[in-house]
Amino acid sequence: MKEEREKKEEVFEEEEFGELLKYTLAGYAGGLGLGWLLDKLGFQQNPIGEWLVRTLAGEGESILEGIFAVKKRLTGAVSSLAQAYGWGKLIGMTVPWWIDLFSRLLGVNVYGWEGFYIPYFYAMSDQIGANVSGFIYLYKKEGNFSKAVKRYFTNPVMLTSLLVILLVPIGLLVARLLGFSPTTNFYAALETVAANLCWLPPLVGMLVEKKKGSD
């Protein structure tokens, strides 16, 4: 009975991680497209414009993934790691809005190296939320903290997520120190897209589930 349930979950997760990957690409396209349009309209270095393009480029998929998780819950689908991932991303997506706002109010140069953390949180706060939510899912499934930790560090999706969370801020800081400055909406979107490696964990999840299915 347990093996049958686990196989059913694997089928769901392969399909669901594939959907999450599509949502990420849609967010990229939306952010870059809106950035280009706002620049054409003359809204460079506009806080609201930058908020919109960073939200779409870094978190557009979170909105769609949150809707995906709600839809799956309402239809009574089997609870899965992909759904937990979607819920976590939706919850974490508002954090960078406040970080961006208070950074500007405090006079931080958001276009210099000092503001490297702003695109990081737009790109990664939902990923951090997804990582935490994924661990909670594993804990509930295992019913034991030490077993959940063991599952976490043997789960390729969770490990990829953790690696992305730790490496992205280093890349952003280096780029800013080398002279990159997001002075246009398109550049702001491009920087956020480059930092938004949230597609990697779903891709790993999809590939792993496909490999399991072929074995």
From Swiss-Prot:
Keyword terms of this UniProt record: Cell membrane, Membrane, Transmembrane, Transmembrane helix
Keyword Transport: no
Chain ranges passing through the membrane: 77-99, 117-139, 152-174, 189-208
A Gene Ontology term for the protein's cellular component: plasma membrane
Main location: membrane
Localization per Swiss-Prot or TrEMBL: Cell membrane
Bilayer topology: Multi-pass membrane protein
Protein name per the record: Uncharacterized protein aq_473
